[in-house]
Every structure is written in structure tokens, then in C-alpha cells.
Amino acid sequence: MKKQKFYWQPELASTIIYWSCTFCILFISLILALENNGPYLISNLVMVPFFVFAYLGIARSFNMTETSLIVRDVLWFRKKALPLSQIEKVTYNEKSIEIFSSEFKEGSKVFLMKKKTIPLFLEALKVKKPELKVAEDHSLGLHKKEEKNKSES
């Protein structure tokens, strides 16, 4: 069977920081280009890292196979094969999903996805693992902050 691919971004703060830094590289390149009237080698060389980081940021994806969910991150060596049997539960809201698994350091991880992609991803996941618990949660990711605050006090 064909692999299914779904694109994602990390939680909101990390996404904003990543794309802000990426577009800073673009703006530096454009500023350098405006300093000269003709093509400017340094400006073009600075634009190359922008395209590399833009591609890496867009290429984050889930690849779903018969037995695992492959989480592809920005860095190629951080690609993680998450066995479907290790996924305990999935919660979602209109813009993000949270996957609970013992494979993650913190026990769960939040992924931002497009509104149209979330139902397709959940449906594909339910086909591969019918007994999976899927629940809607509008306070996605906030329970970690509450637990941390309780443990500090």
C-alpha cells in the first residue's frame, strides 16, 4: 500500500521563531541586493540558506505506513519511526493535534496542521489502528502548563 503523507508544523512558539529567523535571512539578502545596481554575488549567496531553511521548514511531515508513523522533522537525522502500537491516544482541535506516546520525551507532542488535513490524518490513523482513542480537546497543550504550575507550588 502507498505511504500517506501529511504536513505539519511544531507548536506555535517554535513555528514563529523558526519562520522569523528564516525570513530574516531573506530580508538581509534583499537589503544586500538593493545596495548594488546589478546582480550581487553576496546577496545571491545569502539567499541560498533562505531557500534551504524554507524547504526544510515546509518538508516536515508524517509518513504513515502499515505499522508505523514516521515523523520527519527539519533535521534529517531526527526522523523518528513511531510504531502505531505505541500511540496511546490522540487529541485534536481545529488547528492542531496532540499525540500521546511513550516514545516522546514528555509523553506527548503537539503538531499544527491545516484544518482540512486533520480529519484526513485522523481517519487514516483510525483505519490503521481502529482501537485508538481520539478525542476533541479545545485546551490542547494547556494541561502541561497547569501540571507544571501545580508541581511548582
From Swiss-Prot:
InterPro entries in alphabetical order: EbsA-like (IPR020215)
Keyword Repeat annotated: no
Location relative to the cell: Cell membrane
Superkingdom, natural source: Bacteria
Topology term for the membrane: Multi-pass membrane protein
GO CC terms: plasma membrane
Coiled coil (residue ranges): none
Membrane-spanning intervals of the chain: 12-32, 39-59
Keyword entries, A-Z: Cell membrane, Membrane, Transmembrane, Transmembrane helix
Family, per entry: Belongs to the EbsA family.
Function, in words: Seems to play some role in the cell surface expression of a chromosomally encoded receptor, named enterococcal binding substance (EBS), that mediates mating aggregate formation. Might interfere with the synthesis or assembly of EBS, and/or assist in the localization of EbsB to the cell wall.
Name this polypeptide is given: Protein EbsA
Name of the coding gene: ebsA
